[in-house]
Amino acid sequence: MSAPRTLYDKIWDDHLVDSQDDGTCLLYIDRHLVHEVTSPQAFEGLRMAGRKVRAPEKTLAVVDHNVPTSPDRHLGIKNEESRIQVEALARNAADFGVEYYSENDKRQGIVHIVGPEQGFTLPGMTIVCGDSHTSTHGAFGALAHGIGTSEVEHVLATQTLIQKKAKNMLVRVDGQLPPGVTAKDIILAIIGEIGTAGGTGHVIEFAGEAIRSLSMEGRMTVCNMTIEGGARAGLIAPDETTFEYIKDKPRAPKGEAWDRAVEYWKTLHTDEGAHYDRVVVLDAANLPPIVSWGSSPEDVVSVQGVVPNPDDIQDETKRTSKWRALDYMGLKPGTKITDIAIDRVFIGSCTNGRIEDLRAVAEVVEGRKVAPTVSAMIVPGSGLVKEQAEAEGLDKIFKEAGFDWREPGCSMCLAMNDDRLKPGERCASTSNRNFEGRQGFKGRTHLLSPAMAAAAAVAGHFVDIREWK
């Protein structure tokens, strides 16, 4: 009888082509997602070597990072570098026979939202993209992670990837989530617990009652930020929630193929007695709504808490780093989180740009107005999310409240397009990174859930969504 295996072990074993004595392995790749920023050099490398894309039907190209989200984006991209990258992807996709969603295609959006909603992402697959937040797709029980540009070329040419196997880590969130606490709070709490290096060298499997209770949108939020916890990838075993989400998606299996697929997918779970190299357990009942205060995703605290004092940290290097973060953020120790006023609100990104996120925002802001001191924007994660939101009348709620309703794209998650913070502006953001300059030069980013961001937009400062009336 074979030894019990984790979910990660099973997917790895199913895709192992070859292994060397030093641990170097060759993995088969089922799906390759491509966007405009990390692919130009890879395609050019193929062109110069006279190679073709080995499996164009397993490759999908989408523009997302550089595209404008303003209503007039059909007039073209003003920034020359951004325009060149977008035009290059369109040309490369055509030259190499890869399916491509342009900014004028309603299926276009952030690549990690597009893949799942098209059924391109399926359980048990290996999925790569030249983007760190490829871990999002792990919500489906797929082994998904980011790769570099040279690796993008390697996968395009061979449909394989050279890797070394990571360690197994389990993060179990027991119990039921309290009202007002979301998937975003779960993953921020996990990163706060283990730190941004806590998952280094590991693939994390998320489990427990609180994880099982999440929708697929919530599970994608959790897996999306696995990389912020230092791990290579995040995984959640597929179940009926997964199957229901995938069923009838454009690229999902149909008929007998569907039945066979589900039969296989049901085997994708960790065996009883399988070994994890590290186990972390959290109690969902103790989780509050969370807000980040510093310039790292591990710098988090309860919305009812205060900005911590770095002098309480024993490690000198870390203490110095946290003082630098406070200086950058313009905050002082002991300041109540609910006393921090904001200038901007960004709701969107591959972390929280899905229809469930927008519904949560609408529930908070309906019949209310954005504070006069705040500029707020909502960017749907894809054209299909935008279409669904408008069919439900959410756009009207947003506009009446004073939000700017945009076109799909990565937008203000990162300062690679027209949507960015001005120096000194403080933003409540549903994105995944609060690094210095991430949303714009000297911009100050606070990470939080969509409902919390929406409430902050109305109040003009952070508020506890549990007390929202």
From Swiss-Prot:
CDD domains: IPMI
Biological pathway: Amino-acid biosynthesis; L-leucine biosynthesis; L-leucine from 3-methyl-2-oxobutanoate: step 2/4
Pfam families to which the protein is assigned, alphabetical: Aconitase
SUPFAM superfamilies tied to this protein: Aconitase iron-sulfur domain
Domain of life: Bacteria
Catalysis: reaction(s): (2R,3S)-3-isopropylmalate = (2S)-2-isopropylmalate
Subunit-structure text: Heterodimer of LeuC and LeuD.
Function: Catalyzes the isomerization between 2-isopropylmalate and 3-isopropylmalate, via the formation of 2-isopropylmaleate.
Name of the protein this chain belongs to: 3-isopropylmalate dehydratase large subunit
Lineage, uppermost ranks: Bacteria, Pseudomonadati, Pseudomonadota, Alphaproteobacteria, Hyphomicrobiales
Gene encoding the protein: leuC
